[in-house]
């Protein structure tokens, strides 16, 4: 029987009553002491990647069962209603906001607070948060630092993609950018004529180098670097990892160029099966004393989202390493950054994470979601009634495990909107 979400037959809907809370998943990866040899276009024996390719195929087959429902607006709407109903953390965001005086309580806020509470970082008092708007990570770090760590101050800088068109809105839903402009590194398109114009796009090598420089000029040392970037892939979830390769490389490179020795890193990823992703994790393993692949409980188990966490940075880039990696971003190709055959033990640990997070937990919950759809697509209210007791258990357990305390008014972030709470 599964350690994650499970169900069985019995009474007509007894399988709903047996849903159990997920655990925070944390898989450690071994540090690599041998020299790092970066390559412009590394080759990898196909046999090394076989099981990762099989994992990708297996997960995509399960994801594809939902594809026909996405083709019709009516069935797509019903599917999202069902998936929303089985979100065990729906409603928790407002509870956290009102009970603990929290700000910008989004799903991102819950995930970051959980990561901070679980990973035991040595210092989070100075942070660079990339791909950040609307600001859930910054708000969670601020809340944690003042209520759990009791730092006298929290210093931060941040960046996000600034839309190229004046008609596109910056995702500053809470006014965190508007009210704290000096903390932000990206610039409006109106400033394009400036020599150091930077719109925050981390797929551009010159932007990455400039963001890292600006961050370290404004804030030294940087104890924590976070990046929560992800491209909207529409309904094409089977290519989610592939379509995000360059973005995830750029946000990681920005962090490695700016994070101080002894610092910690949190990076969003999705599945971990592509050769380039595997090679990027191999690169990380040379720079951090501890490296983990994680899945917070508040990260929806039906999605592929993962967070790579590095603790205690041991060394900075050499000039040659910086040059090679920036050049790869500028002239991007998705071949591995290193010879993967040199990292067999690390790849075994990564594959264990793939099995645990995606082949077990995600597939099981996707199947659970489809079963709920078949039984309740026209009975959403009934589904909510059945799951209400379980949701309370999940949410109460989360609050106990994550040690929430009230944020004093004097420590709140400055926001420029009357709506400073959560997104339901």
From Swiss-Prot:
Record-linked Gene3D superfamilies: 3.40.50.12760
Stimuli inducing this protein: Expressed in the early phase of the viral replicative cycle.
Keywords, sorted A to Z: Early protein, Methyltransferase, S-adenosyl-L-methionine, Transferase, Virion
TM region positions: none
Molecular function per GO: mRNA (nucleoside-2'-O-)-methyltransferase activity
SUPFAM superfamilies assigned: S-adenosyl-L-methionine-dependent methyltransferases
GO cellular component, one term: virion component
Short name of any one Pfam family annotated for the protein: FtsJ
Active-site annotation: 268
Keyword DNA-binding: no
Domain of life of the organism encoding this protein: Viruses
Enzyme Commission code(s) on record: 2.1.1.-
Main location class: virion
Chain segments annotated as coiled-coil in the UniProt record: none
Listed InterPro entries: Adrift-typ_MeTrfase, mRNA_Cap_2O-Ribose_MeTrfase, RNA_MeTrfase_FtsJ_dom, SAM-dependent_MTases_sf
Domain Adrift-type SAM-dependent 2'-O-MTase: 103-315
Gene Ontology BP annotations: 7-methylguanosine mRNA capping; methylation
Residues the record lists as binding S-adenosyl-L-methionine: 135, 228
Compartment(s) of residence: Virion
Record protein name field: Probable methyltransferase EP424R
Species this protein is from: African swine fever virus (isolate Pig/Kenya/KEN-50/1950)
């Amino acid at each position: 029987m599964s350690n994650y979400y499970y169900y069985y037959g019995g009474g007509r809907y007894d399988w709903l009553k047996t849903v159990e809370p997920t655990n925070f998943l944390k898989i450690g990866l071994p540090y690599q002491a041998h020299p790092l040899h970066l390559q412009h276009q590394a080759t990898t024996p196909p046999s090394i990647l076989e099981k990762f390719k099989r994992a990708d195929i297996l997960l995509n087959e399960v994801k594809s069962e939902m594809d026909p429902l996405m083709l019709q607006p009516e069935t797509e709407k019903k599917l999202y209603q069902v998936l929303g109903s089985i979100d065990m953390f729906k409603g928790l965001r407002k509870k956290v906001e009102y009970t603990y005086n929290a700000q910008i309580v989004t799903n991102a806020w819950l995930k970051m607070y959980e990561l901070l509470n679980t990973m035991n970082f040595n210092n989070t008092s100075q942070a660079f948060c990339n791909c950040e708007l609307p600001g859930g990570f910054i708000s969670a770090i601020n809340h944690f630092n003042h209520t759990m760590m009791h730092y006298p101050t929290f210093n931060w800088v941040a960046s996000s993609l600034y839309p190229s068109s004046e008609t596109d809105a910056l995702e500053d839903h809470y006014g965190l950018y508007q009210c704290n402009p000096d903390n932000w590194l990206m610039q409006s398109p109106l400033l394009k004529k400036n020599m150091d114009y930077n719109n925050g796009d981390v797929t551009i090598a010159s932007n990455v180098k400039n963001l890292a420089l600006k961050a370290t000029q404004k804030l030294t040392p940087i104890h924590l670097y976070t990046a929560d970037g992800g491209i909207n892939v529409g309904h094409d979830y089977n290519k989610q990892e592939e379509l995000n390769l360059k973005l995830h490389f750029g946000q990681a490179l920005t962090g490695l160029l700016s994070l101080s020795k002894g610092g910690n890193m949190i990076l969003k990823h999705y599945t971990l099966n592509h050769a380039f992703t595997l090679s990027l994790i191999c690169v990380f393993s040379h720079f951090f004393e501890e490296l983990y692949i994680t899945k917070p409980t508040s990260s929806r188990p039906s999605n592929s989202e993962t967070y790579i966490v590095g603790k205690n940075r041991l060394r900075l880039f050499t000039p040659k390493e910086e040059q090679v990696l920036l050049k790869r971003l500028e002239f991007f190709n998705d071949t591995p950054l290193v010879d993967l055959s040199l990292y067999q033990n690390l790849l075994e640990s990564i594959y264990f994470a793939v099995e645990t997070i995606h082949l077990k937990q995600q597939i099981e919950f996707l199947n659970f979601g489809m079963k709920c759809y078949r039984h309740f697509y026209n009975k959403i209210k009934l589904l909510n009634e059945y799951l209400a007791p379980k949701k309370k258990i999940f949410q109460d357990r989360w609050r106990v495990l994550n040690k929430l305390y009230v944020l004093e008014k004097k420590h709140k972030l400055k926001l420029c909107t009357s709506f400073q709470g959560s997104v339901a």
